[in-house]
């Protein structure tokens, strides 16, 4: 009896260990886990109706990528996709840290699933892995290890309409596109150019690559197809990277096959928004061009994204990259669709812009700073359309009569350029990011905008998409001081002395002569001791008095043009918070100058509009020699002391005179 009992005891121990192991990896089988999760009910419905998937779970090792119910709500089902569940399964069990750059699915032909790691986030094709709900491990009754990962999107393979094309590479995709389900899109024109230029092998490359294929719609007008040469075709392929839209950082540039010593073309992804929806775009940037390939960027909408193929991923795009054959006018006209990145800008030009379109058509070289769709969602922007004269002036503020790239602004240290608006300039600032990246901001009419899509090339100029409408103020005087990188010191002094608080008042009209940082630096050179005291807490009283001399509060704002009229022959007297400000104004061809206390100073940026006033940025500080004196912290002590010294001196003089007279 001892032998059977010992055998039974050993068997019980083994079963207990197996149960403990199963408990450690997952108390339920993978099938039970999926069935028991209400958020995976749609996926389980697929599973129980597919015999092959059921057999795989029962008999084999497997990794399952299960989409959530929300993912199915965003998925457009098609006839004959009942086997798509097999594209969510592999024949080996992989935890997340065991996943390589690709795994083979169980769908016919074993098309790959591409794995992307981006910091702590993992993507399968374009679907994000929900890591907190993944890595569930179990064993089936045959002892086969199985792993479940939950993803936020349904995984979609290439769909063949003929039933004979499985797991195509990019060349097979292009060459047999009529046998694939691409909706209404056709790619015959691009395929023809690939064959004519003998570039088929580019699309047969083994490994992992990203291919951009323009649809037939983008090959108009007729001269455009002839511009698709070998180098342009190379500019549609990113080697050694599989880039899905959700898994790829925006605005990060990748070298194309057209990145050589003589020609350098990079590609990046971007996202355009109208304030409601987001639309993916791809941008080619020809950094170094040649006689047949212009420098600058070309923007193309991705009309069908994230099509996985054997050697990477394909994106269908609205037009060819690298080809610059539109004028600025034609570029704007190309965004008649409501989801185009400049659709709203183009519409307001048609509605209220007068002959603005004709103006940019006649210009040979221009740069257009075009506000994005999101910029036009501001209420103040919509109110502008009622005043057509004012609106036209604002449109002119967005045009510069020369071709100006971001590189020229940065490398040539361009600070300001005149616009087509009368006596209005644009002012540039380059912000250096922590990763070495550079962001260019542009100010016009008091509005500071960021260039979000630079260097879009046209045959007669350049277009930069910006995130705000220039000339439409949306900040108070205080907020403008806080956010303007040239006015840091004046803002800091105002904060120290509590002077800035009033500048947020919405129902007051301010005219503020604001010294820029360079003006304070000049003052430091002239009087380093006084400059040092300005930034000490003990002298906030005097600082406040100095700033008060720069601020005019009235029932109106004073533009430089208005001040020029007031002081056409004599100096004008403005009621500042501290006494009066007596100024003379001189106007030159491009600038304004003001005279105060016998000193002429340049107005670096006149007429910076704010919601509650106007700012004139200048190169000088209205400061007198006796404004900063040593004394008590509130300023009263030194004034009393100074008065006592002067009075004592006068008494001594009077006493001496009387003694001499006697």
Curated annotation (Swiss-Prot):
PROSITE patterns reported in the protein's UniProt record: FAS1
Superkingdom in the source lineage: Eukaryota
Positions of the pro-segment in this chain: 632-662
Tissue: Expressed on different subsets of axon bundles (fascicles) in insect embryos.
GO cellular component assignments: extracellular space; plasma membrane; side of membrane
Signal peptide segment: 1-24
Entry-linked InterPro entries: Adhesion/Biosynth-related, FAS1_dom_sf, FAS1_domain
Pfam families noted in UniProt: Fasciclin (PF02469)
Gene Ontology annotations of biological process type: cell adhesion
This protein's UniProt keywords: Cell adhesion, Cell membrane, Glycoprotein, GPI-anchor, Lipoprotein, Membrane, Repeat, Signal
Covalent lipid sites (GPI-anchor amidated glycine): 631
Main location: membrane
FAS1 domain location: 27-155, 167-321, 329-470, 474-622
Glycosylated position list: 54, 175, 437, 448, 488, 569
PANTHER family linked to this entry: FI19380P1 (PTHR10900:SF77), PERIOSTIN-RELATED (PTHR10900)
Name this protein carries in UniProt: Fasciclin-1
Organism of derivation: Schistocerca americana (American grasshopper)
Organism phylogeny: Eukaryota, Metazoa, Ecdysozoa, Arthropoda, Hexapoda
Gene: FAS1
């Amino acid at each position: 009896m001892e032998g059977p009992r010992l055998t039974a005891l050993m068997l019980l121990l083994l079963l207990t260990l197996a149960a403990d192991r199963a408990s450690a990896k997952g108390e339920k089988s993978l099938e039970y886990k999926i069935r028991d999760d209400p958020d995976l009910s749609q996926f389980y419905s697929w599973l129980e109706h597919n015999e092959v998937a059921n057999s795989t779970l029962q008999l084999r090792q497997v990794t399952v990528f299960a989409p959530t119910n929300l993912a199915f709500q965003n998925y457009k089902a098609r006839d004959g996709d009942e086997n798509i569940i097999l594209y969510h399964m592999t024949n080996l069990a992989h935890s997340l840290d065991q996943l390589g750059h690709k795994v083979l699915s169980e769908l016919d032909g074993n098309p790959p699933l591409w794995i992307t790691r981006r910091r702590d986030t993992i993507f399968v094709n374009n679907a994000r892995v929900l890591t907190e709900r993944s890595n569930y491990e179990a064993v089936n009754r045959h002892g086969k290890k199985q792993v479940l990962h939950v993803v936020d999107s349904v995984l979609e393979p290439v769909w063949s309409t003929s039933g004979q094309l499985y797991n195509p590479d990019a060349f097979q995709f292009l060459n047999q596109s009529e046998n694939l389900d691409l909706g209404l899109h056709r790619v015959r024109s691009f395929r023809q150019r690939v064959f004519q230029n003998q570039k088929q092998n580019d699309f047969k490359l083994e490994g992992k690559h990203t291919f951009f294929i323009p649809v037939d719609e983008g090959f108009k007008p007729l001269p455009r197809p002839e511009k698709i040469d070998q180098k342009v075709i190379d500019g549609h392929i990113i080697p050694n990277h599989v880039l899905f839209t959700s898994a790829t950082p925006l605005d990060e540039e990748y070298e194309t096959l057209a990145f050589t010593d003589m020609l350098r073309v990079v590609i990046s992804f971007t996202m355009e928004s109208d304030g409601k929806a987001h639309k993916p775009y791809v941008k080619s940037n020809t950094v170094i061009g040649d006689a047949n390939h212009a420098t600058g960027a070309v923007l193309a909408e991705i009309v069908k994204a994230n099509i996985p193929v054997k050697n990477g991923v394909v994106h269908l795009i609205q037009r060819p990259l690298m080809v610059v054959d539109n004028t600025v006018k034609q570029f704007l006209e190309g965004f008649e669709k409501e989801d185009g990145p400049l659709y709203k800008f183009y519409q307001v030009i048609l509605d209220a812009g007068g002959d603005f379109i004709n103006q940019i058509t006649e210009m040979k070289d221009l740069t257009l700073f075009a506000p994005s769709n999101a910029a036009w969602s501001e209420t103040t922007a919509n109110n502008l359309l009622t005043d057509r004269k004012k609106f036209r002036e604002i449109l002119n503020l967005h045009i510069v009569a020369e071709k100006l790239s971001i590189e020229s602004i940065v490398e040539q240290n361009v600070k300001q350029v005149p616009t087509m608006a009368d006596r209005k300039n644009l002012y540039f600032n380059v912000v250096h990011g922590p990763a070495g990246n550079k962001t260019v901001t542009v100010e016009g009419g008091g509005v500071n905008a960021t260039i979000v899509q630079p260097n879009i090339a046209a045959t007669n100029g350049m277009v930069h998409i910006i995130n705000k409408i220039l000339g439409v103020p949306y900040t108070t005087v205080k907020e403008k001081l806080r956010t303007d990188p040239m006015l840091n010191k004046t803002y800091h002094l105002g904060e120290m002395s509590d002077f800035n608080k009033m500048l947020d008042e919405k129902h007051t009209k301010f005219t503020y002569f604001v010294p820029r940082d360079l003006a304070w630096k000049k003052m430091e050179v002239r009087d380093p001791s006084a400059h040092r005291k300005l930034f000490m807490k003990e002298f906030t009283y005097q600082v406040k008095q100095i700033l008060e001399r720069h601020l005019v509060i009235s029932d109106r704002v004073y533009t430089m043009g208005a001040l020029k009229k007031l002081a056409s022959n004599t100096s004008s007297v403005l009621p500042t918070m501290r006494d009066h400000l007596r100024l003379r104004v001189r106007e030159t061809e491009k600038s304004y100058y003001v005279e105060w206390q016998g000193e002429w100073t340049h107005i670096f940026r006149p007429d910076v509009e704010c919601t509650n006033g106007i700012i004139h940025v200048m190169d000088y500080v209205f400061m007198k020699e006796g404004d900063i004196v040593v004394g008590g912290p509130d300023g009263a002590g030194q004034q009393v002391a100074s008065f006592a010294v002067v009075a004592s001196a006068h008494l001594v003089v009077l006493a001496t005179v009387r003694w001499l007279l006697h």
